[in-house]
Amino acid sequence: MAKPKKKVTRIRRRERKNIERGHAHIQSTFNNTIITLTDVHGNAISWASSGQLGFKGSRKSTPFASQMAAETAAKAAMEHGLKSVEVFVKGPGSGREAAIRALQATGLEVTMIKDVTPIPHNGCRPPKRRRV
């Protein structure tokens, strides 16, 4: 019986983009935090989330998890030459400030912080209040 041929897979290394200025989009919900670093046109350079790093369940929504996600995304983006970012924060989650502090701590210069949380003009009915 003939042995199946093994496929040779090569890992293609991404070429280094020389981008010095960019945007950091932090989407912080009640359940997770997603950080995406883009260039000024909105093309993604790197991204990370709390769930991607192995945090499960309620630990995804902690400030520590969003701090780790921000550090991971920032280090990956700094390999492409990113030096300064404008931060756009969206959502009501607990990891907003921790993610911004983590971006500054990794060496990225934060030039602007803007809250872009969508506020409804009496749109959808909100979820019912929790009774604990």
Curated annotation (Swiss-Prot):
One of its GO terms (molecular function) is structural constituent of ribosome. GO terms for cellular component: ribonucleoprotein complex; ribosome. Keywords: Ribonucleoprotein, Ribosomal protein, RNA-binding, rRNA-binding. Disulfide bonds: none annotated. It holds the Pfam family Ribosomal_S11. One of its GO terms (biological process) is translation. Part of the 30S ribosomal subunit. Interacts with proteins S7 and S18. Binds to IF-3. Located on the platform of the 30S subunit, it bridges several disparate RNA helices of the 16S rRNA. Forms part of the Shine-Dalgarno cleft in the 70S ribosome. Belongs to the universal ribosomal protein uS11 family. This is Small ribosomal subunit protein uS11. The lineage of its organism: Bacteria, Bacillati, Bacillota, Clostridia, Peptostreptococcales. The gene is rpsK.
